[in-house]
Amino acid sequence: ANDDPDNDSLINLYEFDNSNVEGFDDNVFSVDNITGSNPIIRDTDGDLLMDGEECFSGEDGYVTDPSNPDSDGDGMPDGWELMHGLDPFDSSDADQDLDDDGWDFNRDETIEQWEKFTNYEEFLNGTDPRNNDTDGDGMPDGWEGYYGLNPNSDEDRDWDSDLDGYDSDRDGELSPEEKFTNYEEFMMDTHPTQADTDGDNCTDGWEIYWNDNRPANETRTLNPLDGTDGLLDYDNDGWEDWEGVWHNFPNWREEEAQTNPWDPDTDNDGMSDGFEADN
């Protein structure tokens, strides 16, 4: 007869009755000397550990419960925890961030608990709790997870998820070099799924493009994290009407009109951009 039909290193007798196994205390995980494991299923609780591994891995008998996939009740299966060097008997490690792949989303220079990408969140997302960039795309798992990107695929690195690039040649399409990619959003600490991070009515990619192409002697900047620069008129290309009222043409309207925020007369026709846009 086959005493171990499920090949889990635990014979049927012990799956039913552990009273004769030296070092085992009866009724550790069940009553009436029953371990609770199934003699014809190798991994009764489906936690990626064979029943025998769960029973014989420690000096004192059970390391984990072969009939309970999550011995410490922290939401992470015993096998997954052991696979990644966590403690299946310590529920507190669910809230830890071992690889420090959270992100300072509110920019207060402190990674608060809500900003961590905890071990439990790593489990839910299928990422490695000991590798801060599971897919190797240069963007931390926690940053990707928070913004709804895929921390298990490097393909989204070069995507422009919020379409906030700038069509500088005005051909109606965003070519690869015109995109403001998710990786560039990470490097600039902008929001990869929100086209205007600072809410100044200038898209992030537009601000980056014109900031990179400002005049050599220009000290002012266009910053996708500065919500005030969209209201400024760097090139002073507003206009005065016949009643002497000045009409400002701020940077956010330059994007709207597709004009150069550093040049008061983008098309060099002798009329200011603001006057042409309003008349």
Predicted regions and their residues:
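Extracellular calcium-associated, cysteine-rich motifs in secreted modular proteins
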Residues: 1-279
